[in-house]
């Protein structure tokens, strides 16, 4: 995850912006791993836990991993819920530069990294769901071990997977797409595209929501996902 320590591989913010630039002009990006590898981790975890089928839910990059898992293991994804995510299409999946820079140009270790993480939360939040000071303080505590390089490695990993539109179009798992209309990192049109590509997918558009899991909407998230899963039992 974002806080995984792999100090032997140094990745700079410049590397991330170069990878983004390559994606924008259609050039391939090479990373140490890609979304497909991370989806394989999920498959192996389910094997280890002896779980044959699962309801797969992911937000942002996690949503992309969930999409890839549902494509690679169609018989094991009972449902798919893709939240604030995208399919890797550079025409729809890039938000504003300020949001991209906030994620790519992360802070250093310890307290400065935690402070920068609160900056990310403020930058990515939607106008109707700004994070409270209490939420920011708690998030900072949880991110004292935040690994900036891990975040940048993961950004390169998702760019290395390229445009997955064709793969996503072939998904058969019942799919729910949830996306904020004011997402500055992965624009709402990315969520619209995801839902349009998958046959029978349902799109829930949330006004005023950015690239975030807003605590004020937690009951709604639970209800939406529970209804989706209950409609398609594993």
Which residues make up each language-model segment?
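Glycine-rich "HGGG/HGxG" loop immediately N-terminal to the catalytic nucleophile
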Residues: 1-33
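Conserved acidic catalytic loop of the alpha/beta-hydrolase fold
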Residues: 36-54
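Short glycine-enriched nucleophile-adjacent loop
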Residues: 63-74, 80
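Flexible "cap/lid" loop of the alpha/beta hydrolase fold
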Residues: 71, 80-108
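Alpha/beta-hydrolase
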Residues: 95-166, 173, 193
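Short beta-strand/loop motif that positions the catalytic acidic residue
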Residues: 171, 177-179
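Acidic catalytic loop of the alpha/beta-hydrolase fold
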Residues: 182-186
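Catalytic active-site module of serine/aspartate enzymes centered on a nucleophile-bearing elbow/loop
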Residues: 201-234
